[in-house]
């Protein structure tokens, strides 16, 4: 494998292995899985039984679309911590959707809600004296020593953050781009919705607007690891 360097230019992407090799890799993994099942006596080796059942509800109360995929159809998986927005996450989610469509599989994003947040501040670009600067806008009072799935968001702070962002950028078009934030605020008001679910609701809303559809979503905290480890 060559030495990899993170791209520095605007809009540049790094793929390894090259994207054109991905369908062949999916097929190779599928064959290996079937061969392993045969060697082990044909046991059902699904590592994620939850994928074959009704998945947890979305933050807005509607159920996530359940994944009912047969043993020989691939599930293309990506994942990341729950953050308000992250270009790298969107790129990965768009790519797994494209790859899943190409190989007849299902695209799945794992929400890593068991990690603690690094910050409760949005980095917002602003122009000061004709020069680009970055302002910090606090959107929550999250603890950095506690998993996101164990915390909740305050709707008043979320609304205040949206107003501050618009006041900072001084650009109506960019303010309209904050429309997905309404999904975060709405989700945060749902009983039992944790911070990771609420933040993910905004990302999911943005992806639905851009793609017209969304990937399957599962939170890591809800995966049945105990059952998997017993197999």
Map each language-model feature to its residues.
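N-terminal regions that are enriched for targeting/export leaders
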Residues: 1-82, 132, 156-170
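Conserved aromatic-histidine-acidic binding/catalytic patches
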Residues: 17, 80-91, 187-198
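Generic structural hydrophobic/aromatic packing signal, biased to beta-strands
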Residues: 56, 76-78, 107-110, 137-139, ...
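Short active-site-adjacent helix-start/loop capping segments
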Residues: 66, 84-87, 116-120
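N-terminal catalytic cores of NTP/NDP-binding nucleotidyl/phosphoryl-transfer enzymes
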Residues: 71-103
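An acidic- and aromatic-residue-enriched active-site/binding cleft used to recognize and process polar
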Residues: 79-82, 110-115, 219-223
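Compact, glycine/acidic-enriched structural inserts
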Residues: 104-173
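Aromatic-residue-lined binding/catalytic grooves and analogous aromatic/hydrophobic interfacial grooves
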Residues: 172-231
């Amino acid at each position: 494998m060559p030495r990899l360097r993170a791209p520095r230019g605007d809009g540049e992407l790094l793929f390894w292995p090259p994207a054109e090799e991905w369908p062949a890799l999916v097929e190779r993994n599928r064959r290996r899985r079937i061969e392993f099942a045969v060697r082990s006596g044909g046991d059902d080796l699904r590592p994620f039984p939850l994928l074959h059942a009704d998945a947890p509800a979305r933050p807005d109360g509607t159920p996530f679309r359940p994944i009912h995929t047969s043993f020989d159809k691939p599930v293309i998986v990506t994942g990341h911590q729950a953050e308000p927005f992250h270009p790298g996450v969107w790129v990965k989610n768009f790519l797994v959707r494209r790859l899943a469509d190409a190989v007849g599989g299902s695209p799945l994003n794992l929400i890593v809600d068991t990690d603690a947040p690094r910050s409760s501040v949005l980095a917002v670009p602003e122009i000061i004296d004709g020069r680009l600067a970055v302002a910090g806008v606090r959107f929550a009072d999250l603890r950095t020593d506690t998993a996101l799935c164990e915390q909740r968001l305050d709707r008043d702070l979320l609304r205040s953050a949206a107003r501050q962002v618009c006041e900072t950028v001084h650009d109506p078009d960019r303010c309209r781009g904050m429309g997905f934030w309404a999904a975060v605020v709405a989700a945060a008001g749902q009983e039992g919705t944790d911070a990771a679910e609420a933040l993910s609701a905004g990302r999911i809303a943005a992806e639905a607007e851009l793609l017209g559809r969304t990937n399957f979503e599962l939170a890591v905290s809800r995966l049945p690891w105990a059952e998997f480890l017993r197999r």
